[in-house]
Amino acid sequence: MSADNESRTGRRAAGGGTSNRQWWPNQLNLHILHQHSALSNPMGGDFNYADEFRKLDLAAVKKDLHALMTDSQEWWPADWGHYGGLFIRMAWHSAGTYRMGDGRGGAGSGSQRLAPLNSWPDNVNLDKARRLLWPIKQKYGRKISWADLMILAGNCALESMGFRIFGFGGGRVDVWEPEEDIYWGSEDTWLGDKRYSGDRDLENPLAAVQMGLIYVNPEGPNGEPDPVASGRDVRETFARMAMNDEETVALVAGGHTFGKCHGAGPATHVGPEPEAAPLEDQGLGWKSTFRSGKGGDAIGSGLEGAWKPNPTTWDMGYLKVLFKYEWELVKSPAGANQWLAKDVADEDMVVDAHDPSKKRRPMMTTADLSLRFDPIYEPIARRYLANPEEFADAFARAWFKLTHRDMGPRSRYLGPDVPAEELIWQDPVPAVTHQLIDRQDIAALKGTILASGLSIADLVATAWASASTFRGSDKRGGANGARIRLAPQKDWAVNQPARLATVLQALEGIRQEFNNAQSGGKQVSLADLIVLGGCAAVEQAAKKAGHDVTVPFTPGRADASQEHTDAASFTVLEPVADGFRNYQKAKYAVTAEELLIDRAQLLTLTAPEMTVLIGGMRVLNANYGQSKHGVFTRQPETLTNDFFVNLLDMGTVWQPTAADKDLFEGRDRVSGELKWTGTRVDLIFGSNSQLRAVAEVYGCADSQEKFLNDFVAAWNKVMNLDRFDLA
């Protein structure tokens, strides 16, 4: 067959065709549990980024970055001969996708270089910033990730323009495929805003106002130039990104001290974004046919101009101009709503970025003007204007928080520029300064705990409640710190406060008795004791099933204080649902099984790990409220594979108890006798074909030992998710 004939037959490559997801749009997405495997990572399984970063000459990298700032390239000329504004925007937009609702987004994975972020409208022309960085990345290779380099470039941009930064911590590890677990919104058009309902209520966990934007629409809500209404959007969005009003004003005013917006001509001249660009453009997008398409002819956001004179110098110009002048609404050359200062003094005129013979009036976006006209922002901005040192410190701290918020505790930061000051948003836990318990102590404490009168279910549920707050997204939560004994965690409904208080009181008594009996400085923390209690309970439950297993335990956790716990910031860690405890706080638009997958992904669990944990937690009787839903066993608190055996039993017929199909009854197929009750979370392991395949492994007659070993391994993983000292 000729090549032409073969082409006409419509031959297709592997991976094409109608996908399962297209056939069944509501199919459970288990792929998010199996992202970022070694199969997609070119660095190899032995690569340790932290070790490589420690070999890096950070001072040399910074020197090269400083030199780059003024090394203007013909293919993408620097505004005023300085790339500082471009790199600040790149770093800001890398970090600015973070939202505290689920901890996802942020700068920690270098995802700006991948879809969809590399092609968001708000990231227009940041592809050029990353290409400008490529020679430096190429030079230092594996010793610095793209994720770290993008933030470091933003820091060096600030320094090169006269600003003193707060510090820098390395340690961000690149991913090699898009982060598909992140819900960016349900809109199917750029700048769509289906995420709102009611009186501009923004859908959780989203923070940005429209699809493809990092923060707010700079022209105002839905493009309407209303500074007061914009202030409401700014406050909501920045709050969801973990910033208070003072931090918000500092970030906006500080960031807009530098650089300019680009809107030299109509957006119709701009070509497709990087993911849609033709092959020959080699990953660069937004090619413009407007004149030269670059420099003074560049088209980006559609807004045009700089906020203040001297856009490559740190000074108070932004706030001075903001309050000094009245502002008139105009259209940019690209047709965007923006504001220009009226009757501008010559000293405040802005020299054109590419033609020093021309001067421009300062501009503001509608969002900028919210700092002047919002009743809360305005006095903060005026205070900063009157106190330059306070403003500089506020911006430095807010910028550091912005760029490090998703990295977890300070102990994860790498490099010589990590600031010494410990900040409350880092969820500080005291250093362990005492001698740790040894193997004999561990065995003795296990015996004491099991003899305390606390049940296996009590101990398992408490250890799980403590450890499972961890979020792999922003590395918050976990058992270290024992914050389960502090507000707000001790009062969360999912933790059954009365029962929790009883368990903690008993464990605290054991802790005090043990510590008081020591003479050589050896101590045990409550954080360690909570986890140890869970491990002892799992071992006891396995013993009841006729098996001797040892659950790994490594001491070294410490107890945090209420003083060093920002209770308000911890409220977002409260589970709206925890399928592992068969808990759901309320009725939601998404199904219980989808919420389970979401939580499993935050716990960095695979589908097999999630499956074996569910089966074990059910027979351990660890449900919220001691409910019997999903407890498919006649011998609770005994670690068997009964959950899987009975779920897969064809002698049982399942029917929903109500129209909402949230709760189900399992009856004997012949007699109709009620055998079990279960939730959607329980039944999904028999319904979903992929999860059923895994469940069948654990339901086999010869699987008890494998079930035990796999459960212990998954349990140990969850208990140690925040033990970064063990990595």
Curated annotation (Swiss-Prot):
Site (Transition state stabilizer): R89
One GO CC term on file: cytosol
GO molecular function: catalase activity; heme binding; metal ion binding
Modifications made to the protein after synthesis: Formation of the three residue Trp-Tyr-Met cross-link is important for the catalase, but not the peroxidase activity of the enzyme.
GO BP term, pick one: cellular response to hydrogen peroxide
Enzyme class: oxidoreductase
Keywords: Heme, Hydrogen peroxide, Iron, Metal-binding, Oxidoreductase, Peroxidase
Catalytic reaction annotation: H2O2 + AH2 = A + 2 H2O; 2 H2O2 = O2 + 2 H2O
Cross-link (Tryptophyl-tyrosyl-methioninium (Tyr-Met) (with W-92)), chain numbering: Y215-M241
Cofactor binding, per record: Binds 1 heme b (iron(II)-protoporphyrin IX) group per dimer.
Region (Disordered) residue spans: 1-22
Entry EC no(s): 1.11.1.21
Amino acids binding heme b: H256
InterPro entries: Catalase_peroxidase, Haem_peroxidase, Haem_peroxidase_sf, Peroxidases_AS, Peroxidases_heam-ligand_BS
Protein family membership: Belongs to the peroxidase family. Peroxidase/catalase subfamily.
Assembly notes: Homodimer or homotetramer.
UniProt-listed NCBIfam families: cat_per_HPI, PRK15061.1
Function: Bifunctional enzyme with both catalase and broad-spectrum peroxidase activity.
Name recorded for this polypeptide: Catalase-peroxidase
